Swiss-Prot record:
Cellular compartment(s): Cytoplasm
This protein's record includes keyword Transcription regulation: no
Binding site for (6R)-5,10-methylene-5,6,7,8-tetrahydrofolate: 194, 288
Active site: 170
NCBIfam families recorded: PRK01827.1-2 (NF002496), thym_sym (TIGR03284)
Source species, domain of life: Bacteria
Catalytic activity as recorded in UniProt: dUMP + (6R)-5,10-methylene-5,6,7,8-tetrahydrofolate = 7,8-dihydrofolate + dTMP
Annotated InterPro entries: Thymidate_synth/dCMP_Mease, Thymidate_synth/dCMP_Mease_dom, Thymidate_synth/dCMP_Mease_sf, Thymidylate_synthase, Thymidylate_synthase_AS
This protein's pathway: Pyrimidine metabolism; dTTP biosynthesis
A GO cellular-component term linked to this record: cytosol
Gene that produces this protein: thyA
Name under which the protein is recorded: Thymidylate synthase
Listed GO biological process terms: dTMP biosynthetic process; dTTP biosynthetic process; methylation
Organism annotation: Mycoplasmopsis synoviae (strain 53) (Mycoplasma synoviae)
One GO molecular-function entry: thymidylate synthase activity
Length: 289
């Protein structure tokens, strides 16, 4: 994961300060790219402990086409809670509940979750129902039947529905590529990258998706290529980034998928294993909402 650490260092030394939507401020560079060869190990960051369970459940949630946080909260994954909570706080039903109390109510009260756990037509909706098109099923079918196609694309950026989303897609567009060695690669374009909190999560998530699609299309894994538009470090993450840059990376872990799974929608959390993951301690930071 030296590629990722090099990006952090590059932004620190060459980036410029920008004001942003969250009013926190960032150090930012535009148009960065890194490549991760999955044959060399699974690219899960080792210079801080990563929330592997959350990464897996979020991807499975996307693949279900789900856009309500209840599935995530029921599995103790709370990475999306802040956005619907901010919407709830503006409602007439808000009685001063904390984020923790809001999350507990999502878990315990299905009616409340249905009303206030919804994020709008975010990733899962666009992946599985982009104006009636199941993009995941379509791209897998195309990889199987027309692997040389230059149209192996999935887009979460639906301009007509952006205003209905709790958060417009940051990782907006990805394309698959099959080479002459029957290796499947994935290239993600991410319009906005929170380099400390979000990007390591995205690297692992799309590398997992690549691995799952490779299995169900009978291909080998190739590269994950990650292009980031506005690559930024939030001003309140600088100390955490410095701590991380002082740490030496460990050897990458190995991803093991249940080989009996032939349909991508049949994967469960129990079908995904990580072997020999060794990392440094967790580094906590606040998410910008």
């Amino acid at each position: 994961m030296k590629q990722y650490l090099h990006l952090l260092e590059h932004i620190k030394t060459s980036g410029t300060f920008k004001k942003d939507r969250t009013n926190i401020g960032t150090i930012s560079l535009f148009g960065l790219q890194a490549r991760y060869n999955l044959k060399e190990g699974f690219p899960l960051l080792t210079t801080k402990k990563m929330a592997w369970k959350a990464i897996c459940h979020e991807l499975l949630w996307f693949l279900k086409g789900d856009t309500n946080i209840k599935y995530l909260v029921d599995n103790n994954v709370n990475i999306w809670n802040e956005w619907p909570y901010e919407i709830f706080k503006k409602s007439n039903d808000y009685q001063g509940e904390s984020l923790k109390e809001f999350s507990q109510k999502i878990k315990e009260d299905s009616s409340f979750a249905q009303k206030y756990g919804e994020l709008g037509p975010v990733y899962g909706k666009q992946w599985r129902d982009f104006f009636g098109v199941d993009q995941i099923s379509q791209v897998i079918n195309d990889i199987k039947n027309n692997p040389t196609s230059r149209r192996l694309i999935v887009s979460a950026w639906n301009v007509a529905q952006i205003d209905k989303m709790a958060l417009p897609p940051c990782h907006a567009f990805f394309q698959f590529y099959v080479n002459d060695n029957n290796e499947l690669s994935l290239h993600l374009y991410q319009r906005s990258g929170d380099m400390f909190l979000g990007v390591p999560f995205n690297i692992a998530s799309y590398s997992l998706l690549l691995s799952m699609v490779a299995q169900v299309t009978n291909l080998k894994v190739g590269e994950f290529i990650h292009t980031i538009g506005d690559a930024h470090i939030y001003s309140n993450h600088i100390d955490q980034v410095n701590t991380q840059l002082e740490r030496a990376p460990y050897k990458l872990p190995k991803l093991i998928l249940n080989k009996n799974i032939k349909n991508i929608f049949d994967f469960t959390f129990e079908d995904i294993e990580l072997e020999n993951y060794i990392s440094h301690e967790t580094i906590k930071a606040k998410v910008a909402v």
